[in-house]
């Protein structure tokens, strides 16, 4: 077994067995070693700077030494080379061994101790592992929501939320970091008018920490609604969707398919509640975060948002909800049909759906 350095001791809680934290972090390193090469160089370096900041426990706004980050990146890449071919380790607790994807079994032991763990698959079918302090547990529409605070182990990419079965894992520390990154991008470019409106009345320049706390707490609600939408979408698409994603992993077809499911989830859950609440700042923040493939797929939704900005009338956005649900469910089923028809060769055909799938 190859050795790899664990995170600093300061990352670990007194209630956490240090050996457990080391194993989880090791599995994170193995996953990163296998998948870090999937990012473009620019995205990779940005993610590594953020990862360095987290591992060193530095404040979000702290300036980073390029020289120090560079040395750390080189060291981390050497460590990844040592573990890339290693299998993921089982977790050892109370005399038992747990598969790293046995979330229910692991959390039965950890939740009473104020800890939470998740192991699941994200974009490009990359395994994501994390271990954190349990902030609170909620129930929402029959689903269990586990909200974490401080993170003791994580991988290069730290998704703020993940749904596994009927459990939603929401990582507040990661969400806070995402909010900060969006605000920082806006401060540099000042081109995102939706973000300008979302932050109106907040003193970003002088009270950044307070703004981060406020916006993060506000966005927790909508992250949960999106994850509930993911569950609802999964109930309509079935297990065949996961099989299809495995087939098209690491292709443009996967990016497209995930964007379609995100759209379906939002039309099923996020947008109906968001528009019903008519929370101006949250609506603006939602559209400020709409980018890439998802924005490209829904020009009509973006125009309806602009109509609301101009008139203050939500009718255009509300009128899109029924048609949006039908449209994205239809596109998702079309992708599944292509997978059934073409099997391992379906990626090319699914990519062909992109042009005619815009709404």
Task: List where the protein language model places each region.
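Active-site scaffold of zinc-dependent metalloenzymes
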Residues: 150-217
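Post-HExxH zinc-binding segment in Zn-dependent metallohydrolases
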Residues: 248-285
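Nucleotide/phosphate-binding site architecture used for ATP/NTP-dependent chemistry
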Residues: 120-159
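Post-HEXXH active-site segment of zinc metalloproteases
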Residues: 3-13, 233-262
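Short, charged/polar micro-motifs that form catalytic or ligand-binding hotspots
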Residues: 210-222, 251-259
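Long, well-structured alpha-helical subdomains associated
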Residues: 37, 58, 65-70, 74, ...
């Amino acid at each position: 077994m190859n050795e790899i350095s664990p995170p600093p001791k300061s990352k670990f809680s007194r209630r956490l067995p240090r050996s457990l934290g080391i194993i989880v972090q090791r599995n994170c390193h193995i996953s990163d070693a296998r998948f870090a090469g999937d990012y473009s160089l620019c995205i990779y370096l940005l993610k590594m700077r953020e990862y360095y900041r987290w591992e060193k426990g530095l404040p979000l706004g702290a300036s980073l030494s390029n020289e120090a980050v560079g040395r750390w990146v080189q060291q981390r890449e050497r460590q990844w080379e040592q573990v890339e071919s290693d299998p993921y380790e089982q977790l050892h607790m109370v005399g038992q061994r747990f598969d790293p994807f046995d979330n229910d079994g692991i959390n039965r032991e950890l939740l009473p101790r104020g800890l939470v763990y998740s192991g699941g698959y994200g974009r490009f079918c990359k395994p994501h592992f994390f271990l954190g302090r349990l902030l609170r547990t909620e129930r929402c529409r029959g689903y269990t929501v586990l909200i974490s605070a401080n993170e003791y182990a994580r991988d290069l990419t730290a998704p703020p939320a993940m749904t596994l079965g009927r459990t939603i894992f929401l990582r507040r520390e990661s969400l806070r970091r995402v909010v900060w990154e969006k605000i920082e991008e806006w401060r540099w470019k000042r081109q995102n008018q939706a973000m300008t409106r979302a932050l109106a009345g907040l003193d970003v320049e002088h009270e950044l920490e307070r703004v981060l706390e406020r916006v993060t707490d506000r966005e927790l609600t909508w992250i949960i609604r999106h994850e509930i939408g993911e569950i609802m979408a999964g109930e309509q698409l079935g297990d065949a969707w996961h099989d299809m994603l495995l087939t098209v992993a690491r292709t443009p077809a996967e990016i497209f398919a995930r964007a379609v499911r995100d759209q379906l989830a939002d039309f099923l859950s996020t947008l109906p509640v968001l528009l019903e609440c008519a929370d101006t700042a949250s609506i603006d923040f939602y559209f400020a975060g709409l980018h890439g493939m998802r924005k490209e797929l829904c020009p009509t939704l973006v125009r309806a948002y602009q109509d609301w900005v101009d008139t203050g009338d939500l009718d255009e956005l509300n009128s899109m909800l029924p048609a949006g649900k039908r449209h994205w469910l239809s596109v998702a089923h079309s992708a599944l049909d292509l997978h059934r028809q073409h099997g391992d060769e379906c990626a090319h055909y699914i990519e062909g759906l992109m042009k005619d799938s815009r709404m």
